[in-house]
């Protein structure tokens, strides 16, 4: 639900580069930690088939800025999330 609300931001990362390369498409998998307070202290690129550093960095940066609901319990949660990009 959190990413659904921010999907427009993630798509802007992609759309800017799509103008330069109309064939640009692929998947970006970001691995990140949701801390006990809902912040994201760590996020990094786990895998990609997009092979576009600008989009990949933008997506990782936006994930890092995202606030999530606090995880159950007192700990943190590790998540791997795939973002699929392709021309509409």
Model-derived features: positions:
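Charge-biased low-complexity segments
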Residues: 1-88
């Amino acid at each position: 639900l959190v990413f659904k609300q921010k999907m427009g931001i993630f798509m802007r990362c992609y759309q800017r580069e799509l103008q330069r390369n109309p064939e640009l498409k692929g998947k970006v998998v970001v691995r990140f930690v949701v801390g006990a307070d809902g912040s994201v202290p760590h996020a990094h690129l786990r895998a990609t088939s997009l092979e576009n550093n600008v989009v990949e960095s933008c997506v990782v940066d936006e994930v890092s800025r995202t606030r999530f609901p606090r995880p159950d319990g007192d700990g943190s949660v590790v998540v791997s999330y795939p973002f699929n990009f392709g021309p509409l």
